[in-house]
């Protein structure tokens, strides 16, 4: 029978007992007695005397320092590999099942950590510790994402070199995380800025550069195999289906081989250009946000809505620049379908699908009409060598209504389409801006030079002026719905394959180069943007679909109204109108039938094909900054790229004292000058790439911050390997899962914020799939399970200007107001961070309460995947729990263990095993908040049941073991004081017995007016109220008392229930 606590005893106080076990001095020697007035003790000045060994901040700090030192000295959390330099001790864990846990590694900020950062790190550490104690061989590494613009900008702002600031920031973050007691294998720590790390980032880029995607094989293949197929004549060096490959840069192939010659007929430079257009890493002109005032290209997020830089408010221009691009779109289908292989939140999977966003349609080719043939008839398909413009459309069934083509102003084919002179009868309004420099408002009808247009205002001049105009507008502005559309006629026409009529080609900024092919067929009757453009430029608006009567009525027009007079485009479903003679017959067909019929017709005449397009664009991969991985690429005299030999890796960043971007005048039209371009003796290099020593020019752009984070999970596996980026045996051991389907596996648990739901995860999956195709990794996906932790929120305060003020300096008044420096401020809740000035340092929490208290509090605040508010005052509750846990084992006066070797009674056994079973399930399910709650309940049970008496060892030990994942330092100390020498991390987690956890039940008869009518089952020893509650819930009780008045219910606990009711 559990002993009840004495009414006069302090709850949980221990004063020593004759049957206690004293802790050994080896592991716990050097304890510093607690001082009065520290956290958890009596406030100074109250007259109370603190027990010498009370668990407070000072004692916690001593315990934490000693155990962290022991963990480091003994390599407690080292996870041996099966082979290689990190394999020492593998024979001890060879029979265990491996489990790989990872956190999304942090950027080492100059401001260090706040208490919101470690939330996920604590969660993964709790889970990793639980799994180790459950018999798994756990790998839990950590590292730093240390390249990139934030680190460079911080260095510029502080006047230091980014290498120095990065190393200092990493050291500070490592110190803060070390104090938290995270059980990482520190031998595997990496930083993406380590030369030994980015040497392999460069190597992986080379694998991508030296590969191409074969749609027939459905995978990447070495570029050497493509060259062999070209040379053998089994594959044609042309773009599109004729070349057997759609995953190419079509325009680049056509530019390199415009006549469609055979491989043997091409010169060496043309051959290399064709090959380069097939590579998974290629160079292409891309529209970027160029800010001369800052001397750099900006991300879309760094540009304001009015087209200026977020920093400095400088003008930003949209202009094409040659950039490195990775052909991620080749993997679009696999990136979608392979989401079925991973255990990720459905919301994250959907975000990735939406980002890729496939659409079904057709690729239609419009043949450019030679000058003077605008009015002539022609074969709609054109000739095989004629210039063509490829357009992707989801509505090929509306081709008959296409009355003009629109290209993005930056489209690579635009220059070739610009005529020398305006065709006869070109309207002045088509000649931006209205026919002459300085603008004008000439009417939209035909007007030649004699009507006032400047004869020197050629198509080239008009296009140049329009491009300058469009360069000042952001993608957001260009995509907005506006009534007045802008554009310029190129002077060229194309032939519509449906009907064979010729239609003009415009450049307009509402078409973006980054979407589709950068060219659209405009069907103004059925698209609102095309409709407004056609109205502005007086272009035909023929209808393909007939609106229903309701649409006409809603718009106040009669059905006979010509479509050119409609008030707006009709974008709904309607019946097909009869089309041209040389067109597929669509009348009477459904939309899907009409699309299918049109695509089949286009394929038959050679003017188009079925196609699938994606919102996903190829990945712009270069940055005009210093602090990033140098590309392992050099350029020859022809400007063509070459990968440097493996033996020359790494290509290290040169030392620079001034690494700032080159700022220019606001209106400077020059290309950006990357910082590396200023290091002349580094840029120019003499190499022998197999044909004798020659002079080459290094690539002076650097890789984006994403590069290092695309593969770090693989380097953790084998971080000291200088021969390979990862040993295949090591990779298979940690990533592949024996017995699973081929290619299944990946990191067993990857934890991080939802803000990385798309880009980081998508880019890492892309790199991994390339490596898988090339045989370098064994799994199809990098991360098997993904878990998104929530955020810690905190109060933030803004002043009258709306500016955030330091939350730590805000005071509250008795009437509920908040003041900063005497002035009122407004309170709001937001994600804890530097920008809201509401950060709380973990160092402060360590010093006030200890690391274990912070760990328990963050896990107890709520579900790991939920946001939760931070309140420093509430952390005291977690500290008091640990104090009670300490007192279940330790006598606060002597510091000795206060436990007794005696068997547990039935109640204690039941409570213990019920707790073990529940806590085991909660740990396994990452429900750490409820695990904390159950441990608190068990601790309270021990305190209440045993009071001043020693705790049975059979309770103290499993309680300590269950608390170990959450509060490892105090658990290690308690385990040591219980007489054990081994680390608690190496001890098996308690196993609950369902039979012992089950409550014994008793069947009690229920009498109604003196006769037994039914029975109820109640837990043995139930209180009277429990019996009454179970009685009221029993269905027979309702039936027996229905329509009766209950006069009295008499409960004899454990024996019988009597109910007196009125007669029926």
Curated annotation (Swiss-Prot):
Q: Which InterPro entries match?
A: Leu-tRNA-ligase, Leu_tRNA-synth_edit, M/V/L/I-tRNA-synth_anticd-bd, Methionyl/Leucyl_tRNA_Synth, Rossmann-like_a/b/a_fold, tRNAsynth_Ia_anticodon-bd, Val/Leu/Ile-tRNA-synth_edit
Enzyme Commission (EC) number: 6.1.1.4
* Database matches in Pfam families: Anticodon_1 (PF08264), tRNA-synt_1_2 (PF13603), tRNA-synt_1g (PF09334)
The cellular location(s) given in this protein's UniProt record come to: Cytoplasm
Q: Motif 'HIGH' region in this chain: where?
A: 106-117
GO MF annotation: an example: leucine-tRNA ligase activity
Q: Where is this motif: 'KMSKS' region?
A: 831-835
Key words of the record: Aminoacyl-tRNA synthetase, ATP-binding, Cytoplasm, Ligase, Nucleotide-binding, Protein biosynthesis
For this record, the Gene Ontology CC terms, alphabetical, are: cytosol
SUPFAM superfamilies in UniProt:
Anticodon-binding domain of a subclass of class I aminoacyl-tRNA synthetases (SSF47323), Nucleotidylyl transferase (SSF52374), ValRS/IleRS/LeuRS editing domain (SSF50677)
Disordered: region residues? 1-25, 435-456
Keyword NADP attached: no
Gene Ontology biological process terms, A to Z: leucyl-tRNA aminoacylation
**Keyword Ligase among record annotations:** yes
Recorded catalytic activity of this chain's protein: tRNA(Leu) + L-leucine + ATP = L-leucyl-tRNA(Leu) + AMP + diphosphate
Q: Where is the signal peptide?
A: none
Which amino acids does the record list as binding ATP?
834
Record's family?
Belongs to the class-I aminoacyl-tRNA synthetase family.
The protein's name is Leucine--tRNA ligase
> What is the phylogenetic placement of the source species in the record?
Bacteria, Bacillati, Actinomycetota, Actinomycetes, Frankiales
Gene name as annotated: leuS
């Amino acid at each position: 029978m559990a002993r009840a606590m004495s009414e006069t005893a302090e709850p949980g106080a221990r004063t020593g007992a004759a049957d206690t076990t004293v802790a050994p001095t080896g592991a716990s020697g050097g304890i510093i007695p607690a001082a009065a007035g520290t956290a958890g003790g009596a406030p100074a000045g109250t007259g109370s005397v603190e027990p010498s060994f009370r668990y407070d901040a000072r004692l916690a700090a001593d315990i934490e320092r000693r155990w962290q030192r022991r963990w480091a000295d003994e390599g407690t959390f080292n996870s041996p590999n099966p082979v290689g330099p990190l394999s020492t001790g593998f024979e001890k864990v060879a029979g265990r099942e491996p489990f790989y846990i990872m956190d999304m590694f942090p950027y080492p900020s100059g401001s260090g950590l706040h208490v919101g950062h470690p939330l996920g790190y604590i969660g993964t550490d709790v889970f990793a510790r639980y799994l180790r104690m459950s018999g798994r061989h756990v790998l839990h590494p950590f590292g730093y994402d240390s390249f990139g613009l934030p680190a460079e900008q911080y260095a510029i702002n502080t006047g230091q070199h980014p290498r120095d600031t990065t190393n200092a920031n990493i050291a500070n973050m490592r110190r803060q995380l070390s104090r938290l007691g995270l059980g990482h294998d520190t031998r595997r720590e990496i930083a993406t800025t380590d030369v030994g790390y980015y040497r392999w980032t460069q190597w992986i880029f080379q694998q991508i550069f030296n590969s191409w995607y074969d749609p027939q094989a459905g995978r990447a293949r070495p570029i050497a195999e493509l060259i062999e197929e070209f040379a053998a004549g089994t594959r044609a060096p042309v773009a599109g289906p004729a070349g057997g490959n759609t995953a190419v840069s079509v325009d680049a192939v056509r530019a390199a081989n415009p006549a469609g010659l055979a491989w043997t007929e091409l010169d060496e430079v043309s051959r290399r250009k064709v090959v380069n257009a097939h590579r998974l890493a290629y160079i292409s002109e891309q529209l970027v946000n160029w800010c001369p005032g800052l001397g750099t290209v900006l991300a879309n997020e760094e540009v304001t809505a009015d087209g200026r830089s977020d920093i400095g408010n400088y003008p930003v221009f949209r202009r094409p620049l040659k950039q490195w691009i990775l052909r991620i779109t080749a993997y679009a289908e696999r990136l979608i379908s392979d989401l079925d292989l991973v255990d990720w939140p459905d919301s994250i999977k959907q975000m990735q699908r939406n980002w890729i966003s496939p659409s079904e349609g057709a690729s239609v080719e419009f043949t450019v009409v030679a000058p003077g043939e605008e009015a002539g008839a022609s074969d709609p398909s054109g000739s095989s060598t004629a210039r063509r413009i490829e357009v992707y459309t989801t509505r090929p069934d509306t081709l008959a209504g296409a009355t003009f083509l629109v290209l993005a102003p930056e489209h690579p084919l635009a220059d070739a389409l610009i005529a020398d002179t305006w065709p006869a009868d070109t309207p002045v309004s088509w000649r931006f801006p209205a026919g002459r420099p300085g603008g004008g408002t000439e009417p939209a009808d035909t007007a030649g030079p004699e009507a006032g247009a400047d004869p020197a205002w050629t198509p080239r001049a008009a296009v140049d002026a329009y491009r300058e105009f469009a360069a000042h507008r952001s993608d957001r502005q260009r995509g907005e719905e506006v009534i007045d559309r802008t554009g310029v006629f190129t002077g060229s026409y194309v032939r519509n394959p449906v009907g064979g009529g010729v239609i003009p080609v415009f450049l307009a900024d509402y078409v973006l180069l980054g979407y589709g092919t950068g060219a659209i067929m405009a069907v103004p009757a059925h698209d609102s943007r095309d409709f407004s453009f056609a109205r502005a430029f007086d272009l035909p608006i023929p209808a393909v679909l007939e609106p229903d009567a309701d649409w006409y009525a809603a718009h106040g027009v009669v059905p006979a109204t010509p479509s050119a007079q409609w008030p707006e485009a009709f974008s709904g479903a309607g019946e097909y109108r009869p089309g041209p003679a040389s067109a597929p017959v669509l009348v009477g067909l459904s939309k899907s039938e009409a699309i299918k019929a049109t695509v089949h017709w286009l394929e038959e005449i050679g003017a188009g094909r079925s196609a699938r397009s994606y919102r996903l664009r190829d990945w712009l991969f270069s940055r005009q900054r210093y602090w990033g991985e140098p590309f392992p690429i050099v350029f020859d005299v022809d400007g063509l790229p070459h990968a440097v030999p493996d033996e020359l890796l790494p290509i290290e960043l040169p030392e620079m004292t001034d690494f700032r971007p080159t700022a220019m005048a606001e209106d400077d039209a020059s290309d950006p000058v990357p910082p590396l371009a200023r290091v002349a003796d580094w840029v120019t290099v003499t190499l022998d790439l197999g044909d004798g020593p020659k002079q080459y020019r290094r690539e002076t752009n650097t890789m984006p911050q994403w590069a290092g984070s695309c593969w770090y999970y693989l380097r953790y596996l084998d971080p000291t390997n200088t021969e390979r980026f990862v040993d295949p045996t090591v990779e298979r051991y940690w990533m592949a899962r024996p017995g699973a389907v081929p290619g299944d596996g990946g990191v067993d648990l990857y934890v991080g914020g939802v803000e990385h739901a798309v880009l980081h995860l998508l880019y890492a999956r892309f790199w991994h799939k390339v490596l898988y195709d090339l045989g370098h990794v064994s799994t199809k996906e990098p991360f098997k399970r993904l878990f998104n932790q929530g955020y810690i929120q905190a109060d933030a305060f803004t002043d009258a200007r709306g500016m955030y003020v330091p939350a730590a300096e805000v005071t509250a008044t008795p009437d509920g107001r908040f003041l900063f420096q005497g002035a009122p401020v407004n309170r709001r809740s937001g994600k804890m961070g530097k920008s809201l000035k509401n950060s709380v340092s973990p160092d402060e929490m360590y010093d006030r309460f200890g690391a274990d208290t912070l760990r328990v509090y963050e896990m107890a605040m709520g579900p790991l995947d939920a946001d939760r508010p931070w309140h420093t005052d509430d952390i005291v509750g977690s500290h008091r729990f640990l104090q009670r846990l300490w007192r279940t084992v330790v006598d606060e006066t002597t510091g000795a263990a206060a436990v007794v070797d005696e068997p547990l009674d039935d109640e204690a056994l039941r409570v213990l095993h019920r707790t073990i079973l529940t806590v085991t399930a909660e740990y396994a399910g990452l429900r750490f908040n409820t695990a904390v709650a159950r441990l608190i309940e068990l601790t309270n049970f021990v305190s209440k049941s045993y009071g001043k008496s020693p705790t049975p060892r059979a309770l103290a030990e499993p309680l300590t073991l269950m608390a170990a994942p959450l509060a490892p330092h105090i658990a290690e100390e308690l385990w040591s004081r219980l007489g054990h020498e081994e680390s608690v991390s190496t001890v098996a987690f308690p196993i609950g017995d369902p039979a012992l956890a089950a409550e014994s039940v008793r069947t009690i008869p229920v009498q109604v007016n003196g006769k037994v009518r039914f029975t109820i089952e109640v837990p043995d020893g139930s209180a009277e109220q429990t019996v009454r509650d179970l009685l009221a819930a029993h269905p027979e009780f309702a039936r027996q008392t229905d329509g009766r008045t209950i006069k009295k219910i008499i409960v004899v606990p454990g024996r019988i229930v009597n109910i007196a009711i009125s007669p029926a």
